[in-house]
Amino acid sequence: MSNYNELIGYVSQSNMADPAVYDSISKWIDVDNHINYNIAQIFIDNRDWPGNNIKFWRPQGNGGKWRWMLYDTDFSFGVPWMGLGYNFNTLQFAVEENGPDWPNPPWSTFLFRRLLENSNYQHRFI
């Protein structure tokens, strides 16, 4: 986890609009995987995420990139959780800076929110 904590520290102290910063981050994470993972979670309307049911991994050794995996999606596809059903804005929920302690505390949306500050990442995500 020290590698991941180092990544988060770098992201928290960097200007995400800087292309050089984005290039550095892309050496830490599989950017395509991160984009696809977030698109999938938002598309299926997973309400038990991102602060819960989040798994990410990295191959051991030098050069391994962080990747995220989709799992435990039973609170998705419009489950009428909190009485909102299909009217819930999952994208807005996933980028809330001060979300509720469950299921999206600020730490769980931090990396995604910061990456969206970069125009290249944002363009690829959209």
Question: How does the language model describe each region?
Answer:
Residues 1-126:
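Catalytic-core segments of enzymes that bind and process phosphorylated/nucleotide-bearing substrates
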